[in-house]
Amino acid sequence: MHLQRIGALHTPFRTLADCPRNGRQPDPAPPCIAAVDPAFHDGLLALDGFSHLILLYWLGPQADSLQITPPFDGQPRGVFATRAPLRPNPVGLSVVAFDGMAGPGRLRVRHLDCVDGTPLLDIKPYLLSTDAEPGATMGWLAPHRTARGAA
């Protein structure tokens, strides 16, 4: 298997400790840039008009363990039952607000929760008809739900 980066994400977060636990926490959400490499600019055709995008990106080192203990919960949980960044395949996913282009190959986005310079793997339009599940449940996270999503 081979993954190819298509660009980089530019955020105000210089270290993992600077990153919010999720991109919905900072209010207001800081502006960020998804910079797409020139070889992939043609893939951005007709992206205008979408209010939200799904960004997939590479988070960095792989996990040592398949279980983690969330700081707000205190109970061990399987990594696949969490949104923890340390994973067997550290692929991150964010639904971001798309605020238009900031120049050729530069997308203005908000609600990212990754370190500046994170490799961008893919961009998909967020589609209300297929990406939102009105009846979705939150499993063990339900008691930790806040006004801005899971803790």
Named regions from a protein language model:
Residues 1-93, 100-151:
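Cys-His-centered catalytic/binding microenvironment captured across papain-like cysteine peptidases
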